[in-house]
Amino acid sequence: MKKAFNILFWAVLGTSNLHAQSLQEAFKDYFRVGVSVNQWEVKAEKEIKEGISYSGAVSLDQTADYEQIAQHFGWVVPENCMKCEVIHPQEGVYDFTLADQLVDKALANGQQVIGHCLIWHSQCPPWFFVDEEGKQVSAEVLKKRMRDHIFTILGHFRGRIVGWDVVNEAFEDNGSLRRSKFYQILGEDFIPLAFQYAHEADPTIELYYNDYSMNKPSKVEGVVNFFRPLVAKGLPIHAIGMQGHMIYGDGDYVKQYTHSIKTIASIGLKSQFTELDLTMLPNPFGFSGANISDQAAYKKAMDPYQDGLPKEKQEQFDQFWLDFFQMLIDNKENVLRATFWCFNDAKSWKNDFPIKGRTDYATLWDRQSKAKPTVQKLIDMAESLEKKNKKEKKSNKK
């Protein structure tokens, strides 16, 4: 088995035209590098090996994909299979099938897993908030459902998952709390309650808050000001996640996120970038963020690169990530990890958001799962910094 893996490893390496070093190796002295994985990468591989016909969302060689994922990323995050509508579709009914496959696959490849996510207003089934008659439940009932949900899931994965996004997207872009069902029934207390329940269920794991548009000062300051007194009182939270769904030309992300990292650090918490991608396509309506309810109508002018990303645009894409990773390195004391959202362009959610049916190029691997030049350029940048640091250390010893 080991010999076969090594052969496949070098075969994949050759086809992707990369050196032996990977992204996770290149940046190991600065922060951790991960990627989100959907259940089809795992489910399809299992079915391919068992000779089962697969006709899922992705028609690629899933086994080869995951070898590259295992090579380059030390951490994986599930895209959807741990969200409430999938894992807890009915009261008292849990389905861990896909999530277990994903976790088992990651652990078998020496990777660690971050759970995503426990409490989120979206992709949460309606039953969570109503009784048998369809009436809104009381605060006490919702608390119990939250606690049962969190305890059951964390108990199931105890010892296999190192950290969880406990609460996801609870704030509006202006820094105010979102008026979700959780908020309507429990008020702002649902957030510290979720962290309390998670810590009680498994005190050994890291716990995170996660949100989009965290480059906006109003939002990051609203989030930080909310957590400041809670952290001072000992709330069990280890980091704040900033999703990082970015649009090329839509602002100075390096400057904005530098401010956000420092703002989060002011309350003693680390930052992590949890859902990184970059669209090179036109912005339909000055849109920013990741609110999945926001959609625009398809227009051909909004989908200009159906036959491939022009060389100039690819070079801009590459330089963006070089600048962004340099920013992460410059702030490495306060950055826990950087996680890319989706492995390749074919699987990226950005093809259908905020406009359905576009051809987007938001990830570091193309539609054939071949690494873009960006990957090697990032590795080269890290190697160059390492050589520079070694040279400076030698010079200081003289």
Regions inferred by a protein language model and the residue ranges of each:
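Short, electropositive alpha-helical surface patch
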Residues: 128-147, 178, 217-233, 351-363
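Aromatic-rich peripheral "rim/lid" segments of glycoside hydrolase catalytic domains that contact
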Residues: 156, 165, 169-188, 194-197, ...
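Noncatalytic carbohydrate-binding groove/subsite architecture in carbohydrate-active enzymes
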Residues: 25-30, 38-63, 181-298
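Bacterial Sec-dependent N-terminal signal peptides
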Residues: 1-23, 390-398
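A general structural detector for well-ordered alpha-helical segments in enzyme core domains, enriched
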Residues: 64-65, 69-72, 95-105, 149, ...
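N-terminal pre-domain/capping segments
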Residues: 21-90, 96-100
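Substrate-binding cleft and catalytic face of glycoside hydrolase catalytic domains
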Residues: 40, 71-89, 98-215, 282-284
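Structural preference for beta-strand elements that scaffold enzyme active sites
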Residues: 30-34, 75-77, 112-114, 161-165, ...
